[in-house]
């Protein structure tokens, strides 16, 4: 992980929102580490909403509607799913403080979840923060084939419909790059962020 970081003894929800507005976000070294630190990557992951790409195979699967997609009905359960170890991800950075902070942002109307349901079981989802015309994606999880990918597609559809300008993925992965995510230098990201944050808070 490239980018500056500094220890922060106590982070409040309001402080967290201010941090997002200037390009910072918190992480922990592990789920068991009680400390948080601010991260400000020199290279930022961004998923351009006008260049979002869905593969033919995924589009075909989405048309079959394998899951019911809901928004903001099980926010804390989504964080819990993201915090659990998974194949290829033996540990995560989501500690108890992260859960508490983002649950507070959710109650304040700033943090949101996209959820994939199979009957009454949550089988995938993602969560993030909405501020101005920007959405900051935090994490995702999947217990069924393509569940988190389908949630991402529905997230982008929703952001486009509501005229969001920026989808920040923090970092890029090969998974996100397959959808069109790109690495953006900090100076360019700062301009994109300032433009999006200058907008009134858009309804998610």
From Swiss-Prot:
It is found in: Cytoplasm. It is an enzyme of class 2 (transferase). InterPro entries: Acyl_CoA_acyltransferase, Leu/Phe-tRNA_Trfase, Leu/Phe-tRNA_Trfase_C. It holds the Pfam family Leu_Phe_trans. One of its GO terms (molecular function) is leucyl-tRNA--protein transferase activity. Its EC number is 2.3.2.6. One of its GO terms (biological process) is protein catabolic process. One of its GO terms (cellular component) is cytoplasm. It catalyses: N-terminal L-lysyl-[protein] + L-leucyl-tRNA(Leu) = N-terminal L-leucyl-L-lysyl-[protein] + tRNA(Leu) + H(+); N-terminal L-arginyl-[protein] + L-leucyl-tRNA(Leu) = N-terminal L-leucyl-L-arginyl-[protein] + tRNA(Leu) + H(+); L-phenylalanyl-tRNA(Phe) + an N-terminal L-alpha-aminoacyl-[protein] = an N-terminal L-phenylalanyl-L-alpha-aminoacyl-[protein] + tRNA(Phe). Keywords: Acyltransferase, Cytoplasm, Transferase. NCBIfam families: aat. Belongs to the L/F-transferase family. Functions in the N-end rule pathway of protein degradation where it conjugates Leu, Phe and, less efficiently, Met from aminoacyl-tRNAs to the N-termini of proteins containing an N-terminal arginine or lysine. This is Leucyl/phenylalanyl-tRNA--protein transferase.
């Amino acid at each position: 992980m490239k980018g500056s970081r500094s220890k922060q003894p106590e982070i409040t929800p309001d402080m967290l929102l201010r941090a997002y507005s200037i390009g910072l976000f918190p992480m922990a070294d592990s789920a068991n580490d009680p400390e948080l630190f601010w991260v400000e990557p020199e290279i930022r992951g961004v998923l351009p909403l006008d260049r979002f790409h869905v593969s033919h195979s995924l589009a075909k699967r989405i048309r079959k509607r394998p899951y019911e997609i809901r928004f903001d009905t099980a926010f804390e359960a989504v964080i819990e799913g993201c915090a659990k170890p998974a194949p290829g991800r033996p540990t995560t950075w989501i500690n108890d403080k992260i859960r508490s902070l983002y649950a507070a942002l959710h109650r304040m109307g700033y943090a949101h979840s996209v959820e994939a349901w199979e009957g009454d079981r949550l089988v995938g989802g993602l969560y993030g923060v909405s501020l101005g015309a920007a959405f900051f994606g935090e994490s995702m999880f999947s217990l069924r084939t393509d569940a988190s990918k389908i949630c991402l597609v529905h997230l982008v559809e929703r952001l486009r419909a509501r005229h969001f300008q920026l989808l920040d993925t923090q970092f890029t992965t090969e998974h996100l790059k397959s959808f069109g995510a790109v690495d953006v230098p900090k100076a360019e990201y700062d301009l994109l962020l300032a433009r999006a944050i200058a907008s009134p808070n858009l309804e998610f």
